[in-house]
Amino acid sequence: MYKKTTLPNGLRIVTGQLPHTRSATVSIYVGAGSRYERDEEAGLSHFLEHMLFKGSSRYPTARIISEAIEGFGGMHNAATDREVTVYYAKVPDSAAFQTIDILADMVREPMMDAAELEKERSVILEELATVEDSPGELAGILIDETMWPSQPLGRNVGGPRRASLPFRSPP
């Protein structure tokens, strides 16, 4: 059974318990996705998804974030869609609260290091090329473009390959 709780600050939390498991999945859903992007911002939500794993105020590098979560025996990842971006980790149940702390710090206080931004740019461009080389994924993109032409819903969630290029880190 799942329970929805809204905190006084408006944060919505969904919890559920499966007593027969010894693991916990912690997910943070952010209301950021491709449908909210203007044409010149296409791909920004996906780009930010990647950047949040590059470091935060208390976990300043990608390696420190990975070592913290994997040190518990956990795994972490993220995904961007049209309406939300989700950051998640699956860890032993004993590490759930520490994992909440790590993911919350990533979302609330990301580092956005200029050098990391430039490195991630090439990773994202390669990822987009891989998607475009997959017949199944490409078919889905073309269907979306056909159904919703000239609209955010008709764009590739990751953005066009050229859209990832203009994003720059703040000075």
State the predicted function of each range.
Residues 22-24, 96:
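A short local loop/turn or secondary-structure capping micro-motif enriched for an aromatic residue
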Residues 12, 31, 134-135:
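Hydrophobic alpha-helical segments, principally membrane-spanning helices and signal/leader peptides
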Residues 6, 17, 64-171:
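Charge-rich, well-structured scaffold segments of protease-associated domains
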Residues 25-90:
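M16/MPP (pitrilysin/insulinase) zinc-metallopeptidase core fold and M16-derived inactive scaffolds
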Residues 1-21:
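N- or domain-start disorder-to-order transition segments that initiate the globular core
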